[in-house]
Amino acid sequence: MAEQNELKPAVAPLWTRDFTIITLGSVVSMLGNAMSGFALSLLVLDYTDSPLLYAIYIATFTAPQIVAPIFSGAILDRFSRKRTIYTLDFISAGIYAAAALILSQGWFSFPVLAVGCFIIGTINSVYMVAYESFYPMLITEGNYSKAYSIASVLETLAAVMIPISTYLYNKVGIAPLLGINAACFLTAAIAETQIRAEEKYIETQRATAAEGESSARRLLRDIREGFGFLWSEKGLLAVACYFAFSSLAGGASQVITLPYFKSTFDNGEYVYMLVWGMMVVGRTVGGLVHYKVQLPTHRKYAIALTVYIVISVLEGTYLYMPVPVMMAMCLCNGLLGVTSYTIRISATQSYVPDEKKGRFNGAFNMLNTVGSLTGQLVAGALTVILPTRLVLTAFMTVTAVAAVIFVGGNRGAVSAIYNRQQ
């Protein structure tokens, strides 16, 4: 027995120095960003009282996420992702500190705010590609699912800051919240400079660089290679296509659900928070379960496909139910959603080589953004002529069909990615 124990490979610890730093840094910046972001939305509505200007405000933040990930992904496969992460956090700290100072003087200009949102949106787009490509490099072998279950819980807990943000905004105004966010970004940036992980992919990419090739030509070649890699990997392409449709339905849900609750129930926004709060509970519980319990490796593909279809059915039908049933369905949706997230991201990030992660994540994020924006626009137009619940059901039906076609229709290629020890 003792001899068998000696032969059994030791499981590497997840909570290494670098992983702890990146996780704590993410918590600090994520909570501060969630709080100030929602408060800024309230500020725009209070000052402009215009749905059109609010839509423009949202668009200026979202628009850079279509193009920026593609170019940043190619660049970040050749340069330090760690340096990019903490540099962008330092810049964000400066921007939010300046905004806090300006707004504390009572000065407000919507055009200036829109430009600032465009800059922040661009920074956020580049940051997300850098973070998503660097984070898996800090995870020890065999701990991908556990690490991403932690990430999903932290992202979910950021939603808790929304009611806190609302309360503080009404009590102290926007400037102190932006100041807090600046301090959060500064703290995260200082901590991230202490990460020691080596980025060996830089040397790998440098060795493949063509001598005498201009930076612009190399960038375009890297972008082509990124899409070529995605196109050549049948399983990754199927997953990316399905999640583009999932984002399409998610965009539709964003523009349908809150207006539906406000027009259907007295104090509908509070009913909305109650129902969707169960989604947060479900994702939190699900993330904690995934941290403790490992799914059977050989069944991850089957579980994922089932989850994709069931989520579409739940989201496509819950608005027809009484509020208590809605809450139960959203709880289930949260549990299943974190399962979907953990399986997909741990599988793909452990599968894609380090030197290609930036381009893959850039392409994946771009497809998701295009899907989300398309869903928002199309759903908004359809609700003018069709019942809102019917529109949401139609989008979710399309997503379920996409799961069957792309994920189910490419069983061998997708299962080869999902059913791996991570």
Which ranges hold each PLM region?
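Juxtamembrane intracellular "pre-TM" segments in multi-pass secondary transporters
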Residues: 2-19, 198-240
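A single, central transmembrane helix in multi-pass transporters
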Residues: 27, 39, 172-179, 222-287
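C-terminal transmembrane bundle of multi-pass solute transporters/carriers
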Residues: 67-70, 78, 82-84, 88, ...
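Transmembrane alpha-helix termini and helix-breaking/packing motifs in multi-pass membrane transporters
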Residues: 41-47, 100-105, 160-182, 263-264, ...
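Cytoplasmic helix-loop-helix junction between adjacent transmembrane helices
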Residues: 116-159
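Hydrophobic core of transmembrane alpha-helices in multi-pass small-molecule transporters
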Residues: 27, 108-126, 325-339
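Loop-to-transmembrane helix entry/capping segments in MFS-fold secondary transporters
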Residues: 51-52, 141-151, 269, 354-364
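Helix-loop junctions on the cytosolic side of multi-pass membrane transporters
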Residues: 106, 133, 137, 178-210, ...
